[in-house]
Amino acid sequence: MKRLGVNIDHVATVRNARGSFHPDPFTIAKHVIKCGAHSVTIHLREDRRHIKDSDVVKICKSRKIITNLEISLNKEIIDIALKNRPNFICIVPEKRKEVTTEGGLNLIKNKKKIKSIISLFNKKSIRTSLFIDPNLKDIKIAKELNATCVELHTGKISNLIKENKSYKNEYLKIKKCSELGVKLGIEVHAGHGLDYKTTSILSKIKEITEFNIGHFIIGESLTHGLKKTITIFKEITNK
């Protein structure tokens, strides 16, 4: 059974647009789980553009919500994650001017730092994932760093599919990375830019155990509601 994680960052984006308390990410997080999602993903960015520290505290504190907290390599953010003890953390690259995460981590450049961070989370029994581009070298490095999981960046294949361009090579990259990850004992997740069609295509890769989807689900739910949107994704991923 493949799992579905729902990123609710843009619930916070809507709230922050009016500087108010509504919609409340914590309330939506609980609703997402009731609607059938396995987990909730939130990204505490350094600039706090959507999710705030108080959101992290409330969501991580709830035992009814399996929380995947996305964080950068920033010490302040790492300390907040350690204090609040989510079920998972996913280390992602972060640039202040980007609209959304633009690519995977540079594991070679940040190897020593990432390994020490993973060690901190492992000691607290917090599972650690690395957000990486689909290449075999990074899968091998993730194993060296003692990461529990990797989340493969699916932005490129998503764009190719949406533009009706050939995506065969990118699909094979993701498939080979997924196979190697499982062979090395690493759990493989996928996320970024996913919609119904792209998720349907990638769900054929049996080694991928989890899809993390945010923007499309939040947007689609404005028309069809969270329950129906989440149900459709669960049906797609487990055909």
Curated annotation (Swiss-Prot):
EC category: transferase
Species of provenance: Pelagibacter ubique (strain HTCC1062)
Record carries keyword Transferase: yes
Catalytic-site annotation from UniProt: H43 (proton acceptor), E70 (proton acceptor), H192 (proton donor)
Name recorded for this polypeptide: Pyridoxine 5'-phosphate synthase
One GO MF term: pyridoxine 5'-phosphate synthase activity
Biological process terms in GO annotation: pyridoxine biosynthetic process
Catalytic activity: 3-amino-2-oxopropyl phosphate + 1-deoxy-D-xylulose 5-phosphate = pyridoxine 5'-phosphate + phosphate + 2 H2O + H(+)
EC numbers, comma separated: 2.6.99.2
Family to which this protein belongs: Belongs to the PNP synthase family.
InterPro entries in alphabetical order: Aldolase_TIM (IPR013785), PyrdxlP_synth_PdxJ (IPR004569), Pyridoxine-5'_phos_synth (IPR036130)
